[in-house]
Amino acid sequence: MSMVYANIFLAFIMSLMGLLMYRSHLMSSLLCLEGMMLSLFVMMTVTILNNHFTLASMTPIILLVFAACEAALGLSLLVMVSNTYGTDYVQNLNLLPC
């Protein structure tokens, strides 16, 4: 494993650990999820470029589309929770009416 792959994998693990440790606030959870998606995007792009696998060159762009959708939904949920309850605690998500 080259140093580039190790650093990208370390960034993913650090984002995952941040998600597991700092999950009390919704904003910190969303930031950690974005870090995970960014490291996955970079890993996929570097792998495709190193292997000259041009058939899968659309895959990182599709991942970015899903990351943008995830960010938009997460921010809309954050705005709804903070307007309703005044805080961005994840425990307030259990109180939302369906």
Swiss-Prot record:
EC number: 7.1.1.2
A Gene Ontology molecular function term of the record: NADH dehydrogenase (ubiquinone) activity
Localization in the cell: Mitochondrion inner membrane
Keywords annotated in UniProt: Electron transport, Membrane, Mitochondrion, Mitochondrion inner membrane, NAD, Respiratory chain, Translocase, Transmembrane, Transmembrane helix, Transport, Ubiquinone
Chain's role: Core subunit of the mitochondrial membrane respiratory chain NADH dehydrogenase (Complex I) which catalyzes electron transfer from NADH through the respiratory chain, using ubiquinone as an electron acceptor. Part of the enzyme membrane arm which is embedded in the lipid bilayer and involved in proton translocation.
Membrane topology: Multi-pass membrane protein
Reactions catalysed: a ubiquinone + NADH + 5 H(+)(in) = a ubiquinol + NAD(+) + 4 H(+)(out)
Subunit structure: Core subunit of respiratory chain NADH dehydrogenase (Complex I) which is composed of 45 different subunits.
A single GO cellular-component term on record: mitochondrial inner membrane
Family: Belongs to the complex I subunit 4L family.
Keyword Iron-sulfur: no
Record Gene3D superfamilies: 1.10.287.3510
Pfam families found in the cross-reference section: Oxidored_q2 (PF00420)
PANTHER family: NADH-UBIQUINONE OXIDOREDUCTASE CHAIN 4L, NADH-UBIQUINONE OXIDOREDUCTASE SUBUNIT ND4L
GO biological process: ATP synthesis coupled electron transport
Protein name: NADH-ubiquinone oxidoreductase chain 4L
Bilayer-spanning residue ranges: 1-21, 29-49, 61-81
This protein's encoding gene: MT-ND4L
InterPro entries given in the database record: NADH_UbQ_OxRdtase_chain4L/K, NUOK/Mnh_C1-like
